[in-house]
Design a protein with these regions (language model features):
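Catalytic alpha/beta core domains of metabolic enzymes, predominantly
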Residues: 98-220, 237
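Active-site beta->alpha loop and helix N-cap motifs at the rims of alpha/beta catalytic domains
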Residues: 25-26, 50-115
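Alpha-helix-loop-beta-strand connector modules within alpha/beta enzyme cores
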Residues: 3, 49-76, 122-129, 180-189, ...
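Mid-to-C-terminal alpha-helical segments outside catalytic/metal-binding sites
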Residues: 240-268
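Glycine-rich, proline-tolerant flexible connector loops at the mouths of alpha/beta enzymes
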Residues: 37-60, 108, 165-166, 223-228
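Histidine-centered catalytic micro-motifs
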Residues: 20, 25-26, 38-48, 71
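Active-site mouth loops of central-metabolism enzymes
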Residues: 6-26, 75-84, 108-113, 170-171, ...
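Conserved, mostly hydrophobic/aromatic
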Residues: 24, 31, 42, 99, ...
């Protein structure tokens, strides 16, 4: 059971109508001060749409890397019409140290998040070949089996990190029973964390921390809510509340240095 918990920040909502690199970078750096050790970013254009053009992504992470030791995690996912090669574009960006890897198809609301096995394998190989550490995003129990089967072909860095994603309409519900079921399928020598999409409270996150999650993702990509009735306009308020929750369970908020050691990520 982990006595230190990594806070992973996902600061930009999928429906954000405007993405300004300097503003996002400032928001990220404020969250570093509050306890974030990883930032999870999709490649978006100034109107917030997913794109293979990495210019604005690179403009966002440059000041973050210059002013902090925060781990940069690029997303290779998101519901879009991009090819898997286009989705893998940020893997070539300087400074990318982790990548979220989606390991199966799933219904997300009214959309199908399409991740067939050949695409998963393609993305996995590019991640491993570049020395990037994958975070395996698992929306359904079967996805855990998918990635374990892929180990026969691809030599993933150990320990593997599984992120249990709950709460999307059409996928696994955000319940304690679902969390326990998903956790039970993850190998005991692997690391795991949680993302609660559409979160209105911190109850499920608190349960995951108590169960030994080594990572919790928080931020506007998943929810603006700080409690059941209030939203916030700054990610840092969510990070601060999560840090307080972690400490309330007599655990420590992991530093970027600790997260790098745990995940086998070299210092820049």
């Amino acid at each position: 059971m982990s006595d230190r918990v990594i806070i992973s920040l996902a600061p930009v909502a999928a429906d954000c109508p405007r993405v300004e690199p300097n503003e996002v970078a400032d928001e990220i750096l404020a969250c570093v001060e509050a306890g974030a050790a990883i930032v999870h970013l999709h490649v978006r254009d100034p109107q917030g749409k997913l794109t293979p053009d990495t210019r604005y992504f690179e403009q966002t992470i440059a000041p973050v890397m210059a002013q902090s030791d925060l781990i940069i995690q690029a997303s290779t996912g998101g519901v879009s019409q991009m090819t898997i090669a286009e989705r893998c574009a940020p893997l070539a960006c300087r400074g990318v140290e982790m990548a979220s890897l989606n390991v199966g198809s799933v219904n997300l609301g009214d959309n199908v998040y399409f991740n067939p096995t050949p695409d998963v394998e393609y993305c996995s190989r590019h991640i491993v070949e570049r020395g990037i550490i994958p975070e395996f995003e698992v929306f359904e129990i079967g996805m855990i089996n998918n990635i374990l089967a892929l180990q026969d072909k691809i030599n993933f860095t150990q320990p593997m990190l599984f992120n249990i994603v709950l709460g999307h309409r059409g996928s696994t519900p955000p319940t304690i029973d679902a969390l326990i079921a998903m956790r039970s399928m993850i190998p005991r020598d692997a690391l795991w964390g949680i993302t609660h999409f559409g979160r209105r409270d911190f109850g499920l996150i608190a349960a995951a921390v108590g169960m030994g999650a080594c990572e919790v993702r928080i931020g506007f990509e998943d929810s603006y809510y700080i409690n059941a009735s209030e939203t916030v306009t700054r990610n840092v308020l969510l990070v601060e509340k999560l840090a307080t929750l972690i400490r309330s369970q007599d655990k420590e908020v992991a530093t970027p240095e600790y997260a790098r050691k745990l995940l086998n990520i070299r210092h820049r």
